């Protein structure tokens, strides 16, 4: 979909660039596939802020998106429409099975209303079709890739994202991710063919601070703009550069400090995304 700019009638419209969503369905979602979503404002059960700079925003309704694609195997479904989803950057597709059952899936690029999609052990390499990643040919572009068999897609789910199959060996598939990381995924993990829809999301410009507030994002205050009681970078006469290596408000090194501690799955990462930056 194309990008949309506006005549600069107001200062915020001068910078505003949005994705043109005219081709999307304009009605409400299927009620049976939705549920309410309560907002926490970044607070935990004690009412204390655990995630800073969150709160407010427009009320949302959760769409139950099928990330597993393991029900109704080998049964073709018809794409009814492509919809906007406020809870993610990608678009979603409503699909209908011959028995009348409906579900939402992540909409890949080049998927249109009226198309047929299917999930099964061996399917055509066509956008929207889902299958075990081990049954797909090397070079295939995929998204919504499972890391654990049957748990549902975890990799490449945001707008414009994808991974590429670059090899197969001993029941495992080698994936190249957008970050540059190469990792092993079990061949029985499901993945969906194609790249995620809405690739132009990376080019939007919100145009004003209020549009970020509509998304539930509050102002992100820099540490050097705080007082010493609030942040290690705070204080000083006039503008200062912090006086120490960048840290979080709790003194943990940031901006490049590695925080991964899951040694159990290190063996599945063949090439780290950090290696190409050296």
From Swiss-Prot:
Pfam families per record: Ribosomal_L2, Ribosomal_L2_C
Q: Which Gene3D superfamilies match?
A: 2.30.30.30, Nucleic acid-binding proteins, Ribosomal protein L2, domain 3
List, alphabetically, the SMART domains matched: Ribosomal_L2, Ribosomal_L2_C
Q: Where is this region: Disordered?
A: 224-278
For this record, the Gene Ontology CC terms, alphabetical, are:
large ribosomal subunit
GO MF entries: rRNA binding; structural constituent of ribosome; transferase activity
For biological process, the GO terms are: cytoplasmic translation
Respond yes or no to whether keyword RNA-binding is given for this record.
yes
Q: What keywords does the record list, in alphabetical order?
A: Ribonucleoprotein, Ribosomal protein, RNA-binding, rRNA-binding
Q: State the protein's purpose.
A: One of the primary rRNA binding proteins. Required for association of the 30S and 50S subunits to form the 70S ribosome, for tRNA binding and peptide bond formation. It has been suggested to have peptidyltransferase activity; this is somewhat controversial. Makes several contacts with the 16S rRNA in the 70S ribosome.
Subunit notes for this chain? Part of the 50S ribosomal subunit. Forms a bridge to the 30S subunit in the 70S ribosome.
Q: What is this protein called?
A: Large ribosomal subunit protein uL2
Per the UniProt record, the source organism is: Methylorubrum extorquens (strain PA1) (Methylobacterium extorquens)
């Amino acid at each position: 979909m194309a990008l949309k700019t506006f005549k600069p009638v107001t200062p915020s419209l001068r910078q505003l660039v949005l994705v043109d969503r005219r081709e999307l369905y304009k009605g409400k979602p299927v009620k049976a596939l939705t549920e309410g979503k309560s907002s926490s404002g970044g607070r935990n059960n004690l009412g204390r802020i655990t995630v800073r700079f969150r709160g407010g925003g427009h009320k949302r309704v959760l769409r139950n998106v099928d990330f597993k694609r393991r029900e109704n195997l080998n049964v073709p479904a018809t794409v009814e429409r492509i919809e906007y989803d406020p809870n993610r950057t990608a678009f979603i597709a409503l699909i209908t099975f011959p028995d009348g059952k409906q579900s939402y899936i992540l909409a890949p690029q080049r998927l249109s209303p009226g198309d047929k999609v299917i999930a099964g052990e061996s399917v055509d390499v066509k956008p929207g079709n889902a299958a075990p990643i081990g049954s797909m040919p090397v070079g295939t572009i995929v998204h919504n890739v499972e890391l654990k068999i049957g748990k549902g897609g975890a990799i490449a789910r945001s707008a414009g994202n994808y991974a590429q199959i670059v090899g197969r060996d001993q029941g495992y598939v080698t994936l190249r991710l957008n970050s540059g990381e190469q990792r092993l995924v079990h061949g029985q993990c499901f993945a969906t063919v194609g790249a995620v829809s809405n690739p132009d999301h990376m080019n939007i410009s919100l145009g004003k601070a209020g549009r970020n507030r509509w998304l539930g994002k509050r102002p992100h205050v820099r540490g050097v703009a705080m007082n010493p009681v609030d942040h290690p970078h705070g204080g000083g006469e006039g503008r200062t550069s912090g006086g120490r290596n960048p840290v979080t408000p709790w003194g943990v090194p940031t901006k490049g400090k590695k925080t991964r501690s899951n040694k159990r799955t290190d063996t599945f990462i063949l090439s780290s995304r950090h290696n190409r930056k050296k």
